[in-house]
Swiss-Prot record:
It holds the Pfam family HHH_5. GO terms for molecular function: ATP binding; four-way junction DNA binding; four-way junction helicase activity. InterPro entries: DNA_helicase_Holl-junc_RuvA_I, Hlx-hairpin-Hlx_DNA-bd_motif, NA-bd_OB-fold, RuvA, RuvA_2-like, RuvA_C, RuvA_C_sf. Residues 139-142 are annotated as: Flexible linker. HAMAP family: DNA_HJ_migration_RuvA. Keywords: Cytoplasm, DNA damage, DNA recombination, DNA repair, DNA-binding. This is Holliday junction branch migration complex subunit RuvA. Residues 143-192 are annotated as: Domain III. Residues 1-64 are annotated as: Domain I. One of its GO terms (cellular component) is cytoplasm. Homotetramer. Forms an RuvA(8)-RuvB(12)-Holliday junction (HJ) complex. HJ DNA is sandwiched between 2 RuvA tetramers; dsDNA enters through RuvA and exits via RuvB. An RuvB hexamer assembles on each DNA strand where it exits the tetramer. Each RuvB hexamer is contacted by two RuvA subunits (via domain III) on 2 adjacent RuvB subunits; this complex drives branch migration. In the full resolvosome a probable DNA-RuvA(4)-RuvB(12)-RuvC(2) complex forms which resolves the HJ. It comes from Herminiimonas arsenicoxydans.
Length: 192
């Protein structure tokens, strides 16, 4: 397996790159979030990669962060979600946004991504619930655990919007229990 590429960026044609690694040019497909953060042509670039082997091709997918690569790996494990669809999902929303959509069970946010219909969105919510939290907590500044889900559900039940609830969750330290988390979140909301 090829886990990382480091070399000179020769071409950028979204979503594909050509990276020269000591005289060998690797074609790498990247999500748009990674693409927008690339250096200019002729500059050094380092990407974490995932190699997909098919009967007719070996395809490299590159990522700017370990979180993106981990989420990609989780996505391709889901029945009906191929590597191209997983790349489209990561191009359509950030890792933190995807985590929050999964935590809040918001299929509507997922269906806004091209190629993701209602059934696919519901499958994503079902398959990823509880799997992404540990990987993505640091990415979005919000903890993601069973306690988080309970706290978020409590805030939503009290009539706060998704946005307000997520902003309040940023004030709740990781590992906080449900009752203390609700108190801290409500305190943060009262100050807003």
């Amino acid at each position: 397996m090829i886990g990382r590429l480091s070399g000179v960026l020769l071409e950028k044609n979204p979503p594909q790159l050509l990276v020269d690694c000591n005289g060998v040019g690797y074609e790498v497909n990247v999500p748009m979030s990674t693409f927008y953060n690339l250096p200019g042509l002729g500059e050094k670039v380092a990407l974490l990669t995932h190699l997909t082997v098919r009967e007719d091709a070996h395809i490299l997918f590159g990522f700017g962060t370990a979180e993106e690569r981990n989420v990609f790996k989780q996505l391709v494990k889901i029945t009906g979600i191929g590597a191209r669809t997983a790349l489209s999902i990561l191009s359509g929303m950030s890792v933190a946004d995807l985590s929050n959509a999964i935590t809040l069970q918001e299929a509507g946010r997922l269906t806004k991504i091209p190629g993701i219909g209602k059934k696919t969105a519901e499958r994503l919510l079902l398959e990823l619930k509880g799997k992404l939290g540990a990987d993505l907590g640091a990415a979005g500044g919000v903890i993601h655990s069973d306690a988080t889900s309970d706290i978020l559900n409590a805030l939503l039940a009290l009539g706060y919007s998704d946005k307000e609830a997520l902003l309040a969750m940023k004030q709740v330290p990781a590992g906080t229990g449900v009752s203390d988390g609700i108190k801290l979140a409500l305190k943060a909301l009262s100050k807003a």
